[in-house]
Amino acid sequence: MEAILMIGVITLCVIFLLSGRNNKKKQEIRELEDYLEDLNQRIVQRTQILSELNEVITNRSVDKSVNMSACEIAVLDLYEQSNIRIPSDIIEDMVNQRLQSEQDVLNYIETQRTYWKLENQKKLYRGSLK
């Protein structure tokens, strides 16, 4: 009877120790999974930052023959395809602005075109000539 009781107690101790080890291993596995998930999120963030930086580098690259960035050339090509002439003053000012994206370049050109259109519609008052 005592032998059976001892075997039962030893069996319970072994089961308790094994379950404790399993819980410890499960906790370590959970911690490692959390760490891997954090690393994956960091990789995704770094990849996004890298793609944004590559886009900025591409937009800032300057064509030495015309001294304009790739985005400026692309927008001017759009105007050329649409048979819209851009005054050289606007182009010179645009090059000096060093705009970063195609949308910025497009907005700048359209703003300048509107300004120059209004400026060129002004007329001299008749009373000013005597």
Swiss-Prot record:
Its main location: host cell. SUPFAM superfamilies: Phage replication organizer domain (SSF140713). GO terms for cellular component: host cell plasma membrane; membrane. One of its GO terms (biological process) is DNA replication. Homodimer; homooligomer. Interacts with DNA; one dsDNA binding subunit is constituted by three p16.7 dimers. Belongs to the phi29likevirus gp16.7 family. This is DNA replication protein 16.7.
